Regions:
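A short acidic, Gly/Pro-enriched loop at the edge of an enzyme's catalytic core
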Residues: 90-98
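A short beta-strand submotif of the Rossmann-like class I SAM-dependent methyltransferase core
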Residues: 100-103
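A short glycine-rich, Lys/Arg-flanked "PGG" loop and its adjoining helix->strand segment in the class I
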Residues: 113-125
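Conserved class I S-adenosyl-L-methionine
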Residues: 35-43
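Class I (Rossmann-like) S-adenosyl-L-methionine-dependent methyltransferase catalytic domain
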Residues: 1-32, 44-89, 114, 130-212
């Protein structure tokens, strides 16, 4: 499958606002012992720019040239890597915080599970993981079920037959199972209005923070 084309998706419509860190991450940031952060799918630096401004050494990985360029111009001190996160090898015992925000649900679960296991296995001891992914309560789930464009595979994964991409939906138990062995710091399943891009629309999201 192809990665989602964020260059096309956000071309000319994505406002560069002053990024504000996710509330849940900000709330537990004091649990992060060191200064090295890895952001898989950095996007426009929603979390990474505030983290860099707080003095963290942030490495951001993204497949989108647009996103990389926006981050570079808004925060030159970020260490930016242009790569598909499926092909990116996480250096062992290097990062005190590894995060991936609104990215993993755009992968087939086989790839996403591999990435999440790599996050868990390569995180430093006492390090933190932060992710958020679509839940099965997301309105897109029902839309995919009734759409001719999306083919239901299994395990709540859909294949977009037009552009050869995937969209996956998760349960809380599934996330807890993937990150078993970590101490759960925070987990929530919420349904909220997204004002971040395009017309206002709802998302069902699972947010998870775990400590090694």
């Amino acid at each position: 499958g192809n990665p989602v084309d964020y260059d096309k998706k956000y071309k000319g419509e994505f406002p560069i606002l002053s990024p504000k860190m996710d509330f849940e991450l900000k709330r537990y940031l004091k649990l992060v012992n060191g200064k090295n952060v890895l952001d898989l799918g950095i996007g426009q630096g929603q979390n990474s720019i505030p983290l860099a401004n707080l003095g963290f050494n942030v490495t951001g990985v993204d497949y989108s040239n647009n996103c990389i360029n926006i981050c570079k111009s808004n925060c030159p001190e970020l260490n930016l890597i242009h790569s598909d996160i499926r092909n990116f090898e996480i250096e062992k015992n290097t990062f005190d915080l590894i995060l991936s925000r609104c990215v993993l649900h755009f992968l087939h679960k086989e790839d996403a599970y591999e990435i999440m296991n790599s996050m868990k296995n390569n995180l430093k001891n006492n390090g933190l993981i932060y992710i958020n992914v679509f839940s099965i309560e997301d309105p897109m789930f029902k839309k995919c079920l009734s759409s001719d464009v999306f083919e239901f595979l299994d395990n709540n994964v859909f294949h977009n037959k037009v552009n050869d991409t995937y969209i996956s939906f998760y349960t809380k138990d599934e996330i807890l199972d993937i990150f078993s062995g970590l101490k759960t710091v925070y987990i929530s399943q919420e349904y909220s209005l997204d004002l971040g891009h395009g017309n206002p629309h709802y998302h069902g999201v699972i947010k998870y923070i775990g400590m090694k």
